């Protein structure tokens, strides 16, 4: 990795001799790509992908991984992710009668409304301070994913005992399960109407966006990362997923792993 945040690739034959004019292409799970050809020294320098933090802690220094998340907080996450991928400023006006333009979440909700990521209620409210449920969050994640990928809902089934085929989010849950984003419970249920926790949120989002924490880098560089007073070590099951989500970093993404380079 150079000081300009570029990834260096060197090719050689079995005898260690440099190989020039080798075409190389890198592509991560977000479909960011870079390609080029090695020079006379067998070297090609390509940029690494930037993963921006999309979730933050609280003013008291905590993250509160097992707390629930509000619908407004969920909207903020997806707005940040879309803004990052599209290179747009987060702004927009919503038509929900309970979303004041003076609230911190107004632009986030307005921005997502433009892309059809969020749904309100029949009385034109959004209920920003209500907890977002597991099913609601999964549905939002699938809609977000469909902005950048060909999502074929309705092509999959799911066997959670509490998710009937006529459940409003059945096709979303089935798609997310097929994509590998979800874990249910040991008793075979999904509990879609339960409030989702902040730890569960980052786990789903990381999987849906192809972000995989580099545990080795994190362990060696804890002093450089954002710290939370209630997450001082890796004893919490979502420690690494939270580190991935809450720290902006450069990374080279492989099929089932990610190498942080800054």
Task: Name what the model sees in each region.
Residues 15-28:
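Short, ordered, surface-exposed loop/turn motifs in non-cytosolic proteins
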Residues 1-15:
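Beta-strand-rich domain onsets/edges
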Residues 180:
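Membrane-interfacial amphipathic helices and adjacent loop/beta segments
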Residues 29-33:
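Glycine-centered tight beta-turn/hairpin loop motif at sheet-sheet or coil-to-beta transitions
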Residues 35-72, 79-106, 115, 119-135, ...:
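Feature responds to low-complexity, polar/acidic, surface-exposed segments characteristic
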